[in-house]
């Protein structure tokens, strides 16, 4: 999972793509032919389609928009950098939700980002929690 929507990668797609496409072509001291033979697609395509990205960009709407446009929607997972904010967690959670909800996303896409992709990636299922037992516990004085 790339943190912070992959950092600057979505914003530098136009540079990273051609730059990595030339891997080894402009370096005189390294033989990268083995690396190039193992790549089955453009290096940029690994970022876009194989990496997961989290939404921890502290509520930045432009960064959220860029990340959603760059990565496959099935590879984006909600994150907030909690508890590292001035309130110990709630600010970044709240602002991340605000940023995502400010964009024109369908509810199914929001569901993927908020929990669906993480459930699939972690091979978990969304099931109802078992009912809590109502046995009374003695109160401490």
Question: What are the roles of these predicted feature ranges?
Answer:
Residues 1-50:
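Aromatic-lined glycan-binding groove of carbohydrate-active enzymes
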Residues 7-8, 32-34, 52-77, 83-141:
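Mid-to-C-terminal alpha-helical segments outside catalytic/metal-binding sites
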């Amino acid at each position: 999972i790339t943190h912070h929507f992959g950092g600057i990668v979505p914003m530098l797609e136009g540079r990273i793509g051609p730059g990595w496409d030339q891997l080894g072509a402009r370096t005189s001291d390294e033989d990268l032919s083995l690396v190039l033979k193992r790549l089955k697609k453009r290096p940029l395509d690994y970022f876009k389609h194989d990496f997961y990205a989290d939404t921890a960009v502290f509520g930045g709407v432009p960064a959220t928009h860029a990340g959603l446009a760059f990565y496959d929607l099935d590879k984006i997972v909600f994150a907030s950098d909690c508890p590292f904010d001035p309130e110990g967690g709630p600010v970044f959670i709240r602002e991340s939700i605000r940023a995502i909800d400010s964009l024109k996303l369908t509810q199914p896409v929001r569901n993927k980002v908020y929990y669906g992709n993480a459930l699939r990636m972690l091979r978990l299922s969304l099931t109802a929690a078992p009912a809590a037992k109502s046995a009374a516990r003695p109160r401490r004085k």
